[in-house]
């Protein structure tokens, strides 16, 4: 995955990336890479370093390029650790296998527990590293990576790391061909409907097969200079449209004949969950109850949440579901891509995996009540995959990762401790119990022709059987080729069901342990599969033998059921069937096959590391980027000739823990030079930062003296601030913020006269001098954000911020803020509600001095948080009565305190098909019906609020400085438009109830609240 990194800044709202653990990073060098790791993963990382050097050799031959300096590789031992990384900004979902970023050209990734999968991810990310190395070098100025479509970038990385033989991608292409939805290059580029990894890989395989693999990298190099469409012509001598037509024809000819001889998806069994004819569904990880009556599964039933459901295994009716992860305080997310849950033997409870507090937890769920009964953290196990509840109900088996290496464990529920069954570098995944509780079947790469850790040559997945008591292991490989995984015992324990792709199709098979014979249970046109090639997709009821499995079709996943009597299957030969069904077209490449050559050669480029002496990872700051210097000049105007400019420098350490920003801004004279230094540290769970800044602002006016000379008056305000802020996240959705700081406001007034002959002199302005103001502050805030954002505003969930900020110095008071927002999504609309209060307590009345500006809260500023639509100051000042008098009384719109309530009905008018009433993704637009009500007052005024109308423009603070509490209200309609992802514009038309002007039109540049 290609990523970019930015500098963190404080947020009013926003979710948290929590650093639950401290990782003691070490580093060592290889020929081409700086390797970063922590001690617990050393063995696996040393092997990964050898993989990286081999991939460098492969990719350097493919790209005909060598690195000029070593690149950083940062390894995490597992996915929960990886999700805490600071090297990548923002949240990382469990579907992110790795990131390559452009600023420091780092590869950041977790180890997967399977050497083969880790090698694939590393090879994929290092393609991105070569892509960046080409795009970012000075000798390639004018090279544009930004304009390349995602399918092109990711498809190239997938093809160069996997090759053309891939049953999972072949399944996707077969499905698209069957439903006549093979995309053109233009559709891939413009539409988000097509998964860029799979379709991009298929296109790149076609290009490499027809024109030679060198053409793939040549196409990339040319695309960065002339654009992708032109690059096809210059590099391949064919237009993108013609290539699309060729690829579509070749894909149909390759996949359709064999697919049409197999069982259509709607005939392989009873569709229980989802509709095989429906598009883009997600129903995965089935786990059928022991009696076969119910099935637990993971599904995305709305735009936002992937959740756990329990359904009737015959009808598909939902009987229970887990509380959504956004509103559940116990965990951050379900683990579902590489794991399935397990039922207790009595069928009353269901165990599943979550991400919580930086690690995986085993949760048990009361199926009847929907209540989470237990939460279990297994000590000394970094990550957990695939639970299996024992027949006696006393143990749960699982695959656990420690130091990036997977092993089998059995957890004793009563003793609350785990026993490790295996202890080696082989992949040990997807355990399941035999009916007698003596044996675990699991997926592994051990055994004859298994993984060789010296040559890093990987054995294909097969079935392992381990005696739980003795630890003795034997392997079963029903077919000599292909992946064989996801074992499930039959109720009598005499057979093992599994999924295999030995003939290029992913089907369910049965292996008879007594006969040592294999039987085909399904013959599906597309395939039995989960999200990834190795995701769990099959479950068999422990007592009844009912089978449930997920099927890929129409670009999505449905769950199909079969009764026990239809799971016997037809006997097949152990050698399987010769087939090219897993090969992406062209099946017989005519170009140079460099990719196939190096994928079949594990030794070339593989070298030993030699003696390694890791050292502590440096916390040195490196210059990340320079905000481009700018210089401008102006002649004339209020300030006369001026020179202005600015530059910024941004620094960070290699692990992303520290960020330092330095900015300098100049506007005119030495007095007008400003700047700031901002430092943040996110190494620990308590994030903190310090800042120092100086910001001058100048305001000028021109006039004439009695004798006709010009007078230039320049007023300056100098704001100098120092502050520190800390944030302690309790979870991804809530945090505590602390702040301390001080501000000095200095004032300067200069005046010069200019004669008609150009002579000037400085003059004094009696009484213009002003003493500086000083403020100190301390703040405490509790912030929560469990919202899901749309394209112009939040759609679901909620946000809140409660803050107290004592201010002391030139004026003493306490600022209080309470801001609470809720969003209720009822497809396709959202009902949004907000309540807000801001008050400066202890500030007293308005005193007529400059400090009033610091305690004033307004309802009439469109860019303040408390704006009531229809009552902007600018709009009121334009009213005829204000224009006639030259003064306009707007006291009703400000006070030392304010309160606001808003409600909106948000209708997604234009946007992506999945979200909007009409598809037009280029200018997403929401139609909004709104109602606002606000009131501003000072400390003595809220006793008798008045809703009288037509008083705006007439009321002002009374002689004592107080403001009467007179609410203002409005209702109307607005349109929020996302303009090219850069700005969000809201145009509103409001009916005002406390203005003589009944209707008001306005425009605001900001996202919806």
Model-derived features: positions:
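Juxtacatalytic substrate-recognition/specificity segment
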Residues: 10-149, 166-168, 186-188
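Beta/coil-rich, acidic/histidine-enriched accessory regions frequently appended to metallopeptidases
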Residues: 12-27, 191-194, 218-332, 336-341, ...
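Active-site-proximal alpha-helical
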Residues: 35, 59, 151-166, 174-240
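A flexible loop/linker signature enriched in serine peptidases of the S9 family
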Residues: 278-281, 298-309, 325-336, 351-363, ...
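Blade-terminus and WD-like Trp-Asp/Gly-His loop motifs, strongest in beta-propeller folds
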Residues: 286-294, 341-349, 386-395, 431-439, ...
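Repeated loop/turn-to-beta-strand initiation elements of outer-membrane beta-barrel proteins
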Residues: 371, 472, 517, 655-661, ...
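Outer-membrane beta-barrel initiation region
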Residues: 563-685, 767-795, 911-913, 937, ...
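C-terminal outer-membrane beta-barrel translocator/porin domains of Gram-negative envelope proteins
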Residues: 691-697, 703-705, 711-715, 722-725, ...
């Amino acid at each position: 995955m290609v990523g970019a990194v930015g500098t963190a800044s404080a947020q009013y709202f926003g979710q948290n990336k929590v650093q639950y653990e401290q990782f003691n990073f070490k580093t060592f060098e290889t020929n081409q890479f700086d390797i970063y790791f922590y001690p617990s993963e050393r063995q696996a990382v040393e092997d990964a370093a050898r993989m990286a050097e081999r991939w460098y050799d492969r990719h350097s031959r493919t790209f005909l390029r060598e690195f000029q300096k070593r690149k950083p590789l940062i390894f995490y031992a597992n996915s929960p650790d990886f999700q805490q990384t600071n090297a990548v900004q923002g949240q990382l979902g469990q579907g992110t296998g790795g990131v390559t970023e452009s600023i420091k050209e780092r590869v950041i990734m977790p180890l997967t527990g399977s050497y083969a999968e880790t090698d694939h991810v590393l090879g994929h990310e290092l393609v991105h590293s070569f892509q960046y190395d080409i795009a970012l070098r000075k000798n390639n100025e004018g090279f544009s990576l930004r304009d390349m479509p995602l399918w092109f970038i990711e498809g190239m990385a997938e093809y160069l790391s996997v090759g053309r033989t891939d049953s999972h991608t072949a399944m996707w292409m077969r499905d698209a061909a069957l439903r006549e939805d093979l995309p053109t290059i233009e559709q891939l580029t413009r539409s988000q409907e097509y998964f860029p990894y799979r379709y991009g890989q298929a296109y790149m395989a076609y290009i490499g097969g027809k024109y030679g693999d060198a053409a793939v990298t040549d196409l990339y190099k040319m695309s960065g200079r002339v654009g992708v469409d032109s690059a096809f012509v210059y590099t391949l001598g064919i237009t993108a449209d013609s290539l699309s037509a060729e690829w579509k024809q070749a894909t149909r000819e390759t996949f359709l004949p064999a697919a049409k001889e197999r069982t259509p998806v709607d005939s392989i069994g009873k569709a229980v969950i989802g509709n095989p004819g429906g598009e883009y569904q997600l129903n995965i990880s089935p786990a059928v109850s022991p009696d076969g009556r119910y099935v637990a599964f993971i599904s995305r039933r709305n735009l936002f949440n992937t959740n756990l459901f329990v359904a009737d295994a015959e009808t598909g009716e939902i009987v229970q579901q887990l509380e959504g992860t956004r509103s559940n305080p116990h965990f951050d997310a379900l683990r579902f891509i590489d794991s399935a849950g397990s039922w207790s033997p009595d069928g009353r409870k269901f165990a599943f995996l979550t991400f919580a507090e930086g690690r995986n937890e085993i949760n048990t769920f009361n199926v009847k009540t929907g209540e989470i009964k237990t939460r279990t953290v297994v000590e000394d196990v970094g990550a957990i995959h695939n639970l299996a509840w024992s027949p006696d109900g006393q143990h749960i088996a699982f695959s656990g990762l420690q130091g990036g290496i997977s092993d089998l464990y059995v957890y004793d529920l009563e003793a609350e401790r785990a026993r490790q069954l295996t202890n080696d570098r082989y992949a040990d995944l997807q355990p399941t119990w035999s009916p007698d509780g003596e044996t675990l079947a699991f997926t592994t790469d051990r055994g004859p022709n298994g993984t060789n850790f010296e040559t890093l040559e990987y054995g294909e997945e097969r079935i392992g059987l381990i005696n739980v008591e003795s630890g003795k292991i034997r392997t079963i490989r029903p077919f000599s080729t292909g992946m064989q995984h996801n074992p499930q015992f039959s109720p009598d324990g005499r057979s093992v069901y599994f999924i295999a792709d030995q003939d290029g199709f992913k089907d369910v098979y049965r292996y008879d342990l007594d006969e040592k014979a294999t039987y085909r249970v399904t013959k599906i046109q597309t395939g039995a599969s989960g999200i990834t090639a190795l995701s769990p997709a099959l479950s068999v009821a422990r007592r009844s033998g009912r089978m449930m499995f997920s099927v890929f079709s129409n670009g999505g996943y449905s769950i199909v059921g079969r009764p026990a009597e239809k799971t016997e299957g037809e006997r097949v030969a152990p050698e399987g069937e010769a087939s090219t069904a897993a090969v992406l077209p062209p099946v017989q490449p005519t170009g140079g096959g460099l990719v196939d050559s190096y994928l079949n050669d594990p030794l070339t480029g593989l070298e030993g590391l030699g003696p390694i002496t890791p050292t502590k990872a440096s916390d040195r700051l490196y210059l990340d980027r320079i905000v481009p210097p700018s210089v401008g000049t102006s002649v004339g105007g209020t300030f006369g000739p001026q020179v202005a400019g600015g530059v910024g420098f941004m620094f960070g350490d290699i692990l992303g823990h520290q960020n330092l920003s330095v900015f300098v801004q100049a506007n005119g004279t030495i007095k007008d030079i400003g700047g700031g230094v901002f430092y943040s540290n996110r190494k620990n769970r308590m994030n903190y930062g310090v800042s120092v800044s100086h910001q001058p602002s100048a305001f000028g006016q021109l006039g004439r003296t009695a004798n006709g000379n010009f007078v230039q008056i320049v007023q300056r305000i100098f704001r100098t601030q120092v502050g520190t802020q800390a944030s302690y996240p309790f979870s991804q959705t809530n945090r505590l913020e602390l702040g301390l700081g001080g501000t000095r406001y200095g004032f300067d007034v200069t005046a010069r006269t200019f004669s008609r002959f150009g002579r000037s002199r400085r003059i004094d302005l009696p009484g213009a001098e002003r003493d500086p103001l000083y403020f100190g502050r301390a703040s405490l805030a509790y912030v929560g954000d469990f919202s899901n954002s749309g394209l112009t505003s939040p759609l679901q969930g909620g946000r809140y911020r409660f803050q107290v900020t004592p201010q002391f110095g030139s004026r003493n008071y306490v600022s209080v803020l309470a801001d609470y927002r809720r969003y209720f999504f009822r497809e396709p609309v959202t009902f949004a509600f907000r309540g807000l209060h801001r008050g400066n307590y202890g500030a007293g009345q308005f005193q007529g001095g400059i400090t009033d500006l610091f305690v004033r809260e307004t309802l009439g500023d469109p860019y303040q948080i408390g704006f009531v639509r229809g009552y902007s100051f600018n709009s009121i000042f334009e009213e005829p009565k204000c224009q006639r008098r030259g003064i306009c009384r707007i006291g009703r719109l400000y006070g030392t305190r304010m309160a606001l309530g808003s409600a909106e009905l948000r209708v997604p008018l234009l946007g992506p098909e999945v979200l909007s009433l009409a598809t037009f993704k280029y200018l997403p637009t929401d139609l909004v019906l709104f109602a606002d009500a606000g009131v501003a007052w000072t400390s003595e005024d809220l006793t008798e609020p008045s809703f009288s109308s037509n008083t705006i423009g007439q009321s002002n603070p009374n002689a004592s400085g107080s403001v009467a509490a007179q609410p203002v209200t409005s209702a109307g309609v607005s349109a929020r438009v996302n303009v090219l992802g850069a700005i969000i514009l809201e145009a509103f038309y409001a009916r005002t109830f406390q203005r003589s002007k009944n209707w008001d039109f306005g425009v605001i540049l900001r996202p919806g609240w």
